[in-house]
A protein has these predicted regions:
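Short secondary-structure boundary micro-motifs
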Residues: 10-11, 105-107, 114, 154
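Residue-identity detector for threonine
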Residues: 22, 28, 105, 122-126, ...
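Active-site gating loop/helix substructures
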Residues: 67-85, 100, 111-194
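Conserved loop->alpha-helix
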Residues: 95-98
Length: 194
């Protein structure tokens, strides 16, 4: 929650200086990802103006962050027997809490084109950065895929995962068509199926 509060303060500072309108790219991890997901949810999944952030988003999120617990929300998901399979994949429980208790119901593909948002996490298999964006998911080692109907809440939960707290997010990688470029700086057209 500390990271979320910190990022809420940073966005407030930017809004007070009329700077939210100048942002073209945002890269987040952990609490920053969770907070930005809630900002988008509060604005109908569009980027807020500085005035909109100060008058609507900031007060709403300040109140919600003081009244709700993401950790207890994730634990409450175990009251549903269908979620028992996630006992060891607690990030999946966090994703369910974001959907059911915080209302984060959009898919990655529903995010706006601007600002370009990179939601970052780490793969358990390689330890490399795994990135979620509006139009792609993946990393340079495993490859990239179109997100399809991938839930924003799942991407946020994966970004917030950490050992001992919320473990890795479990999802079916076989549901995606992965592509990889032969080299980091190769043209996108050179990507081949993995």
């Amino acid at each position: 929650i500390r990271a979320m509060i910190f990022h809420l303060g940073v966005l407030r500072h930017l809004a007070e200086n009329g700077a939210l309108e100048t942002i073209s790219r945002v890269s987040t991890v952990s609490g920053g990802s969770l907070l930005l997901g809630l900002v988008f949810k509060e604005c109908g999944y569009v980027w807020p103006s500085s005035d909109q952030f100060l008058s609507l988003v900031y007060p709403a999120l300040r109140d919600q962050l003081c009244a709700k617990s993401l950790q207890w929300g994730a634990a409450r998901q175990l009251l549903r027997p269908a979620n028992w399979r996630y006992l060891l994949s607690r990030s999946n429980l966090l994703a369910k809490a974001l959907q059911h208790e915080w209302g984060v119901t959009a898919e990655l593909s529903q995010l706006p084109r601007a600002p370009e948002w990179s939601i970052n996490g780490t793969t358990a298999e390689t330890g490399k950065r795994f990135r979620f964006k509006r139009d792609s998911v993946g990393d340079y080692t495993l490859g990239y895929s179109a997100p399809g109907e991938f839930p924003l809440a799942d991407a946020l939960a994966m970004s917030a995962a950490f050992p001992g707290g919320f473990g890795p997010l479990s999802f079916e990688a076989g549901n995606f068509q992965w592509k990889k470029r032969p080299a980091w700086d190769s043209p996108l057209e050179s990507a081949a199926n993995v």
